[in-house]
Amino acid sequence: MRKLWSSTVPGKDRSADIIFHFHQELPKLLRGYHQCTKEEAAILGALIYRVKYAETKADISSCLKSLIPSDLAKIMSSHEWKKEIARAYNKDSGMSPDEAKIAFLKVIYRWPTYGSAFFEVHQVSDPSFPEHLIVAINKQGVNMIHAQSKVL
């Protein structure tokens, strides 16, 4: 099931955040559609880890692909990612998985691409645009995003 929204504020409707919004936004982050810093990625990775494993101390390195955006995976070694995610995870000790979902949404809510529907586009007609684009459609309109740099 998919929920469409145009004026959602994380935390305002906890049930919708926990049931719909988190699960709709997570794959968009992991596919690398949003412009995200490595610091934000580590924080979000820790929140995703908490959603999946709560307080269980499983091995972070074995599940990195499900914690960080695909386009950022190679900017640090697995060991460095594990260290940064563990650091962020330890800062939020005692947070429940549902609270982690809302905290995740509050981070990405600040981004101009929050709540977008994304489309990967291969274009050949306009040489002033890159060959590979991501088209993001949200309440602010239609955005053309460079697939590698994530610049709007």
Task: Label each region the model flagged.
Residues P27-K28, Y33-L152:
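N-terminal recruitment modules of adaptor/scaffold proteins
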Residues D17-I18, I134:
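Generic detector of ordered secondary-structure context
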Residues P10-S15, Q35:
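Conserved, non-catalytic sequence blocks in retroelement Pol enzymes and Pol-derived host proteins
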Residues I19-H23, A41-A42:
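Non-catalytic, well-ordered alpha-helical scaffold segments
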Residues M1-P10, I18-H21, K28:
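Cationic-aromatic interfacial patches
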